[in-house]
UniProtKB/Swiss-Prot annotation:
It comes from Arabidopsis thaliana. It catalyses: ATP + H2O = ADP + phosphate + H(+). It holds the Pfam family SNF2-rel_dom. This is ATP-dependent DNA helicase DDM1. Disruption phenotype: Reactivated transcription of heavily methylated silent loci, via chromatin demethylation. Hypomethylated chromatin; gain of histone H3 'Lys-4' methylation (H3K4me) but depletion of histone H3 'Lys-9' methylation (H3K9me). Altered leaf shape, increased cauline leaf number, and delayed flowering onset (due to FWA derepression). Accumulates developmental abnormalities and transcription derepression by slowly inducing heritable lesions (hopymethylation) at unlinked loci. Derepressed paternally inherited MEA locus in male gametophytes and seeds. Reactivation of several silent retrotransposons. Interacts with the MBD domains of MBD2, MBD5 and MBD6. ATP binds at D227, Q228, M229, G230, L231, G232, K233, T234. ATPase activity is stimulated 3-fold by DNA (both free and nucleosomal) binding. ATP-dependent DNA helicase that plays a role in formation, organization, stability and heritability of heterochromatin and thus regulates several physiological traits. Binds to the nucleosome and promotes chromatin remodeling in an ATP-dependent manner; induces nucleosome repositioning on a short DNA fragment, and, possibly, could be guided to target sites (including silent transposable elements) by small interfering RNAs (siRNAs). Can bind both free and nucleosomal DNA. One of its GO terms (molecular function) is DNA binding. Keywords: ATP-binding, Coiled coil, DNA-binding, Helicase, Hydrolase, Nucleotide-binding, Nucleus, Repeat, Transcription, Transcription regulation. Residues 214-382 form the Helicase ATP-binding domain.
Amino acid sequence: MVSLRSRKVIPASEMVSDGKTEKDASGDSPTSVLNEEENCEEKSVTVVEEEILLAKNGDSSLISEAMAQEEEQLLKLREDEEKANNAGSAVAPNLNETQFTKLDELLTQTQLYSEFLLEKMEDITINGIESESQKAEPEKTGRGRKRKAASQYNNTKAKRAVAAMISRSKEDGETINSDLTEEETVIKLQNELCPLLTGGQLKSYQLKGVKWLISLWQNGLNGILADQMGLGKTIQTIGFLSHLKGNGLDGPYLVIAPLSTLSNWFNEIARFTPSINAIIYHGDKNQRDELRRKHMPKTVGPKFPIVITSYEVAMNDAKRILRHYPWKYVVIDEGHRLKNHKCKLLRELKHLKMDNKLLLTGTPLQNNLSELWSLLNFILPDIFTSHDEFESWFDFSEKNKNEATKEEEEKRRAQVVSKLHGILRPFILRRMKCDVELSLPRKKEIIMYATMTDHQKKFQEHLVNNTLEAHLGENAIRGQGWKGKLNNLVIQLRKNCNHPDLLQGQIDGSYLYPPVEEIVGQCGKFRLLERLLVRLFANNHKVLIFSQWTKLLDIMDYYFSEKGFEVCRIDGSVKLDERRRQIKDFSDEKSSCSIFLLSTRAGGLGINLTAADTCILYDSDWNPQMDLQAMDRCHRIGQTKPVHVYRLSTAQSIETRVLKRAYSKLKLEHVVIGQGQFHQERAKSSTPLEEEDILALLKEDETAEDKLIQTDISDADLDRLLDRSDLTITAPGETQAAEAFPVKGPGWEVVLPSSGGMLSSLNS
């Protein structure tokens, strides 16, 4: 007889998908669940002694419980302040003909400067970096005076910056000995540019990134390093800072990053540049005062450390303390958080005295203008000063009736966006792994479909008709109910796609999981998962399985336990020391653990799991970038095997229909322009889709292609899809070994690789 595991029963009014209590029905959404996991990730940290903060080769966990609590308190204070400040909002004016002409002229002029800057910066990067002796010549403009001018970004000063760049581009750097191999050339250049970087060897494209950062610095410009995740943005930044330190520029330098990554920054600086001091500036007010007193004097000298701090501490101390330091360079890690134009960090950074800013982000830019404005404001703050004014440039709502056709309005928008892209071009560097990390094994992503079981179809029918509680009987727990917000209906439909036990266990209050045979038999995707794993384990593959729902991970944990499999697991409740232990165990070649269960948000960031060569996305995140970050846990530098990604989807369900629209940016995720207004669909103030719209999605007629693809995959096709020989090319010019296989068929479709984002071709 199959043993059963106890299941904790929580009143329905308190249930959410990650096991935490909720205060309203909307908290049952993946968004709220994942936000809580992110918060929990930052709170769940190990306790360490204060002096470890300065240990150059200490443990990777340097974040104490007190620091996490301080972070939480600062976050609450900031949220309260923002609520008070957001009492009212101004209405943006419409853009008339005169305004549009003026805007077009401004953008055209600024774009010309940007194109000129780009051309000359490329010359500098190719021909070499200005030598220190050239910088010291008295006839040239002094660094302090020139940098102050170049940072203003008005027309006159932009011309000065361009003129200075023309002068430098004519000065050839040292020629590299053509007899050297590519590796020897890279080593020689690294020793010249980054003499203090002694703890590792940069790759060729990373060294080019350092040279690009230096060219920005020499011209007083801000920049965005947007290399794809896993290409080493941290080490490129450290290499650049070591170049400045090695040339007598003592700083100070400030790194602002998420709390969970502070220890990684500290340890990477210690590893690659052991002669450079660094501190983690965090703790309560008294601890921060003590850190400043001991390590951050007003007079900056060679011993002044690189200061690493979190967003919350930076925002809290910007006006009162950090503004008194003349920061040479400020680095903002995970810079995509600045894409919200209302971000307080953007506002607080303006209080700091800083020569330049660098934003690091592995998330490509999306197709929305609000995000684009934030980046333009970050790069060119004196030109793009007002978000309301920027909004008005695209507000043609009053012109629809009289002055322009819809096509003309769209043409105007396209013209403006095209020019804005041109302005950003010189200031962003983005490389893809497929372009620069040629030694990285190839990756293939395949969507696999599973049809609903009769059990799931019956649940879906009851959900649509609001009769599920009655169907499950009198034992249903009352409280939250199922009638009400549409978002709640969408979530319940998605739960049914993932596994109907997510619904049944919540409603009937069952203490026990069903037998393993029922767990598999009740759900189409779980059947497909079992078929996949049998084949993968037979070929000794290690597998990462991602889901947004921690309760679904509970079901999987139970299933694997009953089957006798050893499992590792990370979600928002797992503390950092336990994470490190599990990652180490999973990465051990002798380990018997071949399965790693991870929640998409808590387990999709900041960890290296290249021991696995297979990633299964059991359910897809509303934000496709989260899934890309999850895939990159195993497809990154250090991977030696071809990687397969299997994205599971329930055929002809709300899951496939709504996600299809999310990916095409029509609903539920990205900022869109409609009716002349900006709407953030996931924002609390957004208007939810009407119930008839969601029900209409369920009733949509499938195309002939959909009917062909969205069905169960045969065993023969499954075996052919799991073959990876087409990803293995052992010699230059060798043809693919695997027989040609169609990109789609009954039960599957191969995802064609794409970099995504509106600026994906920026550095092509």
